[in-house]
Amino acid sequence: MALRWGIVSVGLISSDFTAVLQTLPRSEHQVVAVAARDLSRAKEVAEKHDIPKAYGSYEELAKDPNVEVAYIGTQHPQHKAAVMLCLAAGEAVLCEKPMGVNVAEVREMVAEARSRDLFLMEAIWTRFFPASEALRSVLAQGTLGDLRVARAEFGKNLTHIPRAIDWAQAGGALLDIGIYCVQFISMVFGGQKPEKISVVGRRHETGVDDTVTVLLQYPGEVHGSFTCSITAQLSNTASVSGTKGMAQLLNPCWCPTELVVKGEHKEFPLPPVPKDCNFDNGAGMSYEAKHVRECLRKGMKESPVIPLSESELLADILEEVRKAIGVTFPQDKR
């Protein structure tokens, strides 16, 4: 039976997700509604993608009984309101990362989903790429021996994108791209809470974080480190090393198609890319969509691959790091 999706917001990421859903079998996934704050934009997207319903408000989509799961692709500060709206209406939710601007927001959304017994997942698409799944298998099999250290880098000059440097939109490197580095290290070390976090970094002139390097000490004397930046080009790779070797996700590590394990190079080709995709390897969004359907058809309320407790942990780490270099957002004062 097809999973019936409602798309909240018509920005670039929502556009890609919608296009990718259209490439999947209609017997499994259907986009039944799209909402924007401007009805004409919603109608435009509905026409382009052959979506039956277009709404000029998120409230209307939340009330649509035909929508089974809502995909939230709004700007970071609008995630919480949209998620709460859809949960209150009884819809399951897949929310773009970062789920919230800070950990308090994430905890509120998680509590709401649990109190209503509804499915909620943070759309950390990286986890569902076959290359990431292959890496998890390598780790589970002990191929690398006793783990010692994990390292991730994600940086490119994003200053031409207004949202990326906009303090009011919770811009900056950490929430936009640093989350990919944190989730990688967290995945490697099994979602444990770090014992100690050390941070160095610089702020952008607009008040958001610019370039940040973080060291995370974990139980068992293992550690991870990452650097993220919205002004500097970095290697955009992620690696984990143990007593028997190293594994590395090659660039682009946030949507990986290549994994090197102890010198052996493996490729994981993506499905065909829909036309008009805005982001690199956009076709890879299909993996998380399939996972959501699988979870919902099994009656699950959260994903075992990115559980809600880990979404809370990631938000907690990112907030601590952000505040360590003196970046606070309006949401922190509520």
Curated annotation (Swiss-Prot):
It catalyses: (1R,2R)-1,2-dihydrobenzene-1,2-diol + NADP(+) = catechol + NADPH + H(+); D-xylose + NADP(+) = D-xylono-1,5-lactone + NADPH + H(+). InterPro entries: Gfo/Idh/MocA-like_OxRdtase_N, Gfo/Idh/MocA_domain, GFO_IDH_MocA-like_dom, NAD(P)-bd_dom_sf. The record marks 71, 79, 97 as: May play an important role in coenzyme binding. GO terms for molecular function: D-xylose 1-dehydrogenase (NADP+) activity; nucleotide binding; trans-1,2-dihydrobenzene-1,2-diol dehydrogenase activity. Disulfide bonds: none annotated. The record marks 180 as: May play an important role in catalytic activity. The record marks 176 as: May play an important role for the adaptation of the alcohol substrate into the binding site. Signal peptide: none annotated. This is Trans-1,2-dihydrobenzene-1,2-diol dehydrogenase. It comes from Pongo abelii (Sumatran orangutan).
